[in-house]
A protein has these predicted regions:
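Secondary-structure junction motif
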Residues: 64-85, 153-161, 168-171
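A local structural motif
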Residues: 83-92, 128
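Short Pro/Gly-enriched coil loops immediately N-terminal to beta-strands
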Residues: 29-45, 53-61, 134-143
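A late-sequence structural motif
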Residues: 129-171
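Short beta-strand-centered segments that line the small-molecule binding cleft or hinge
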Residues: 2-39, 43, 80, 106-109, ...
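Short beta-strand-to-loop elements that line the ligand-binding cleft
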Residues: 1-2, 21-22, 67-68, 88-97
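Short secondary-structure boundary segments
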Residues: 22-23, 45, 116-118, 143, ...
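Short, hydrophobic alpha-helical packing/hinge segments within bilobed ligand-binding/sensory domains
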Residues: 5-7, 100-102, 119
Length: 171
């Protein structure tokens, strides 16, 4: 689901709490930042950028960058983290899911920006897509919790957030 759909469900009361990438504009909610999730470059193993130990965001200029379609916060967060404007990158194709983007990269169509947590979750086939970090560690997004401001469960949600923060290295 797109983030806006999840936030709408939160406002309707269909969901009590969300784990999502921040910031995301929403009214009448509280948020709690949990951790930073670095972006990594995903590229075909024979791509020139895959041969490097670490990259600069400027290395992305002129590359065929495969991203999710407009409306997905991952797209906006990835571009923002790399301090890139839409006009600075070539986006020949867009996809509706991260797994589709990864398959397009594996097919040699271009490169992409992958959240580290997705890579750790096994979204990327290791033999078909090479993953390279960026220098400096500041190419990342924030992951956090969001809940309705007037919920009677705020204390529980903050405790959940504290638990996640305290155990994130083991996740």
């Amino acid at each position: 689901d797109q983030s806006q759909d999840l936030i709408d469900a939160l406002h309707r009361g269909d969901l009590d709490i969300l784990l999502l990438a921040l910031p995301f504009p929403a009214e009448s909610v509280e948020t709690m930042t949990l951790f930073r999730d670095p972006f990594l470059l995903g590229a075909p193993p024979d791509h020139p950028l895959s041969q490097r130990k670490a990259l600069k965001t400027s290395d992305l200029r002129g590359q065929d960058l495969l991203l999710l379609e407009d409306g997905h916060c991952l797209r906006e967060h990835a571009l923002e983290a790399c301090k890139l404007r839409e006009s600075e990158v070539v986006t020949p194709y867009q996809a509706t899911s991260l797994s589709t983007v990864v398959q397009m990269v594996a097919s040699g169509i271009g490169v992409t920006l992958l959240p580290e947590m997705a890579v750790k979750a096994g979204v990327v086939p290791a033999k078909e897509v090479a993953v390279t970090p960026f220098q400096g560690g500041d190419v990342s997004r924030e992951i956090g919790l969001m809940w309705r401001r007037k919920t009677p469960r705020q204390t529980e949600f903050r405790l959940l957030g504290d638990f996640i923060v305290g155990h994130q290295t083991s996740m």
